[in-house]
Amino acid sequence: MLEADNIRADKKRETANTHHINARKKDSASPTAFDKEVFTPDSAHQSNSNKENPACHFNVPKNVTLQRNEKGLALVKDGMELRADFLSLLPRTDHNKIHRELLVRAAKIKGEQNPIAIDATAGFGEDSFLLAAAGFTVYLFERDPIIAALLQDALDRATQTPELAAIANHMTLIEANSITELAALSSGSSSVLTETMRNDFPDKETLRPDVIYLDPMFPERTKSAAVKKKFQLIHILENPCENEEELLSTALNVRPRKVVIKRPVKGPFLANAKPSYSLKGKAVRYDCFVFA
């Protein structure tokens, strides 16, 4: 099914690239949040092109650099590199495994052959990649411009990797505040999201996603030093969700068929809202709100 949709997906990604630029202009980070503008690419990859040099659009924090090498764009601090990449997820996308993923089970819409999902808190897009591998068309929102640049770089690399391309072509990144965009969707107002969805699904009378996925960052409890450092580096750019009530209420107002929320397995409900049901794993729990 994924291969059969490649032509539509290619057209969608061309449109998404334009929308990604527009969203960045509209929702760019405040320059007061950073000390100075820095970009340190390998000399072999230096370019005057904004497409090749995405960091020219924004500032990076003090003592942190963006570097591009043969592996792609990375955030670097004190010898620690942080790079978005989907290749390690490939074994989990096997047809016999993907539908056993707890996230996919939580997001599944019975009887829907071409479901649409919105990942309102994309981060590095790993969960969206799993949803896309399961057959979802996924719109990813990331509000931080640096994380968005790292994610877009990973998507661009994935579309050039044969074993990842069919999945990545079902993922569209929009750099914008998801609360603003979801509010526009629920009210019928024009926005980057609504324009993108209309272009992708011109025959749909009602623009409504089947699933909205929320993954507000929560404290990482793993004993792995490498993973702890990774989250420390992410938190330099973006803090855990501070407006969880607004995020959840805005998602619920869209009235998708499901809202799925990722939480620590023993953590409280997001905004203290009780879901329709939950699916529990060893470390995480998916709280599901179901609508008719």
Question: Over which residues does each language-model region extend?
Answer:
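S-adenosyl-L-methionine
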Residues: 1-12, 20, 24-25, 33-42, 144, 148-204, ...
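SAM cofactor-binding core of SAM-dependent methyltransferases
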Residues: 100-107, 115-118, 122-160, 176
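Conserved proline-anchored active-site loop of SAM-dependent methyltransferases
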Residues: 117-130, 209-228
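Short, glycine/acidic-enriched loop or turn micro-motifs at the edges of active sites
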Residues: 122-124, 145, 180, 218-219, ...
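Mobile active-site "lid"/loop adjacent to the S-adenosyl-L-methionine
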Residues: 216-247
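Conserved Class I SAM-dependent methyltransferase catalytic core
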Residues: 244-290
